[in-house]
């Protein structure tokens, strides 16, 4: 029988950094609320959560890297919202942020979770920030807890 490794959703004793983009703040505040709720419900103490605000999604990877490099956290949760406009700016920002977050995670061997919405419309962002399509901040926090615990077992 093969050995199976799985993470679990018990957050006691875990510490997380959260990076939040302020651009589209009416959405990112909801993502942050969802993430904080998930962390609390899974046993992460308030004093084990640190939040850094950045101007927008493009700035998220730099602060996430600084947090990951500090070795103070079991995971870093990145939250932001990039909404398509009439120019190619959306593609550039979305691509660079997603690549940056993935690279930090791989380079640091730390769960750096991508909770950045990349959507076509404001309505889609609202749906993913706590209405019809759930709250992606909540989902990102759950992924961070699960991955932090999984990496401790491998």
From Swiss-Prot:
HAMAP family: Lumazine_synth. Pathway: Cofactor biosynthesis; riboflavin biosynthesis; riboflavin from 2-hydroxy-3-oxobutyl phosphate and 5-amino-6-(D-ribitylamino)uracil: step 1/2. It holds the Pfam family DMRL_synthase. The active site is at residue 89. It is an enzyme of class 2 (transferase). Keywords: Riboflavin biosynthesis, Transferase. It comes from Desulforamulus reducens (strain ATCC BAA-1160 / DSM 100696 / MI-1) (Desulfotomaculum reducens). GO terms for cellular component: cytosol; riboflavin synthase complex. Catalyzes the formation of 6,7-dimethyl-8-ribityllumazine by condensation of 5-amino-6-(D-ribitylamino)uracil with 3,4-dihydroxy-2-butanone 4-phosphate. This is the penultimate step in the biosynthesis of riboflavin. This is 6,7-dimethyl-8-ribityllumazine synthase.
